[in-house]
């Protein structure tokens, strides 16, 4: 039986989010609707999640002592990492000492904080099909890996980054030094190690939102949302849609792979598992033990969004992954470099039939920073995509 207390009282059920961006903000709102007291933590002030949490803190989350001090002060029941750049070894110690439970598990946060840990788990331990890959910690070893079998074209990424930061598509050797320097500059913690991957010729990419929750019999069960298709530019998600049409054979394979990798990570919560698909063939790409940016589309498509599913699963509550209707999402970019921007033409954006928007409230805009998202629902995927893009395009960011 799940027991939830009263926020801001001695009986409160307390959840601490490490990372308070736009995805964390939606998780906070979902938790608060269930009566949870939420503490939001990020590395900068006035992050989106700070604006809606019961309490907000700013600390360097890679600082183990600062992280421990805050956890001991706030005494959360659950710690929910929403980003990769965290002192995960300290989280493991906190969990081992019984101070708080880490979602989904401390081990999962350690493995998924960098691409090396999760790729070795998926490909080498679980035997999942992936692209050819290698790891390198110098330009010389990177060159040797490419010449030794990865080949051109290839993709180079920092082992630790997110949202496409530091990612390059390299066509030939003349572009290698630039890609190496870019990857090193964008890595969040370990700035000297990269993964290089062979390019997979795929038809489309999907995110399979996978939920591990506790069923009525007390055992962990695994449920899947309808596949989310998405389009990326330079590693950044720019639009997504649900459901992505695909063969039953490919979908069954993706579900089997997702169940295997999330089962190996353990714990409860929602995972974003990414795949490349060509015909009936499926390649595992990445997994995040938290809601996924491409899953913002579920705000318009599912009975319970990915954020509500995550909140319910971590609290031990029943989940419903059913699709309500097709839909799509499109990103609203900053377009400027400025603080405290304003958004014009919001009325015009919302005049597009069957659409809604979310403005994230980020304190600073960058040219390619995601400042909001438009979502559309309907009966036809392509029509939903067109309306989401239209609504997003009508919003104007001004200084």
Curated annotation (Swiss-Prot):
**Keyword ATP-binding (UniProt):** yes
**Residues at which Mg(2+) binds:** 274, 286
Keywords, comma-separated and alphabetical: ATP-binding, Ligase, Magnesium, Metal-binding, Nucleotide-binding, Purine biosynthesis
Q: Which reaction does it catalyse?
A: N(1)-(5-phospho-beta-D-ribosyl)glycinamide + formate + ATP = N(2)-formyl-N(1)-(5-phospho-beta-D-ribosyl)glycinamide + ADP + phosphate + H(+)
Describe, as the record does, how this protein assembles with itself and its partners. Answer: Homodimer.
Domain (ATP-grasp): give its ranges.
120-315
- Can you say what this protein is called? Formate-dependent phosphoribosylglycinamide formyltransferase
Q: Which GO terms describe its biological process?
A: 'de novo' IMP biosynthetic process
Query: By its UniProt entry, which InterPro entries does this protein fall under?
Result: ATP-grasp, ATP-grasp_carboxylate-amine, ATP_grasp_subdomain_1, PreATP-grasp_dom_sf, PurT, PurT/PurK_preATP-grasp, PurT_C, Rudment_hybrid_motif
Q: Where along this sequence does the record place binding of N(1)-(5-phospho-beta-D-ribosyl)glycinamide?
A: 22-23, 82, 293, 362, 369-370
**Enzyme Commission numbers on file:** 6.3.1.21
Record lineage:
Bacteria, Pseudomonadati, Pseudomonadota, Gammaproteobacteria, Chromatiales
Q: Quick one: which gene encodes this?
A: purT
User: Family, per the entry?
Assistant: Belongs to the PurK/PurT family.
Indicate the segments annotated as coiled coil, or none if absent. Answer: none
Pfam family for this entry, one: RS_preATP-grasp-like
């Amino acid at each position: 039986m799940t027991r939830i207390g009263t926020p801001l009282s001695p009986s409160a059920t307390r959840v601490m989010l490490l990372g308070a961006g736009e995805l964390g903000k939606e998780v906070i709102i979902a938790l608060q609707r269930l009566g949870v007291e939420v503490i939001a933590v990020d590395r900068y002030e006035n992050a989106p999640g700070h604006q809606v949490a019961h309490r907000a803190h700013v600390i360097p989350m890679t600082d183990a002592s600062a992280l421990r001090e805050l956890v001991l002060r706030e005494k959360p029941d659950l710690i929910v990492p929403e980003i990769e750049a965290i002192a995960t070894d300290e989280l493991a110690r906190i969990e081992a000492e019984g101070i708080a439970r880490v979602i989904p598990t401390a081990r999962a946060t350690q493995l998924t904080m960098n691409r090396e840990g999760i790729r070795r788990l998926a490909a080498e331990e679980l035997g999942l099909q992936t692209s050819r890959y290698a790891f390198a910690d110098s330009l010389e070893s990177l060159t040797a890996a490419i010449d030794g079998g990865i080949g051109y074209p290839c993709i180079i990424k920092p082992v630790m980054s997110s949202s496409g930061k530091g990612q390059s598509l390299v066509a030939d050797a003349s572009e290698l030094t630039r890609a190496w320097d870019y990857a090193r500059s964008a890595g969040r913690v370990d700035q000297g190690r990269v993964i290089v991957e062979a390019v997979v010729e795929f038809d489309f990419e999907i995110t399979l939102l996978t939920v591990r929750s506790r069923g009525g019999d007390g055992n962990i069960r695994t449920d899947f949302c309808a596949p989310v298709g998405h389009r990326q530019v330079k590693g950044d998600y720019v639009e997504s849609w649900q459901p992505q049409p695909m063969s039953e054979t490919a979908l069954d394979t993706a579900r089997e792979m997702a169940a295997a990798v999330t089962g190996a990570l353990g714990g409860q919560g929602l995972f974003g598992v990414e795949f490349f698909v060509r015909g009936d063939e499926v390649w595992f790409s990445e997994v995040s033990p938290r809601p996924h940016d491409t899953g913002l589309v579920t705000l318009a498509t599912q009975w319970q969004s990915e954020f509500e599913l995550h909140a319910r699963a971590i609290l031990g509550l029943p989940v419903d992954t059913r699709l309500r209707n097709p839909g799509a999402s499109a990103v609203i970019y900053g377009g400027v470099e400025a603080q405290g921007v304003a958004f014009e033409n919001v009325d015009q954006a919302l005049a597009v039939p069957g659409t809604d928007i979310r403005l994230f409230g980020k304190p600073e805009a960058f040219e390619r920073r995601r400042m909001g998202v438009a979502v559309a629902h309907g009966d036809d995927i392509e029509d939903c995509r067109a309306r989401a893009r239209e609504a997003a395009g009508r919003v104007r960011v001004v200084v």
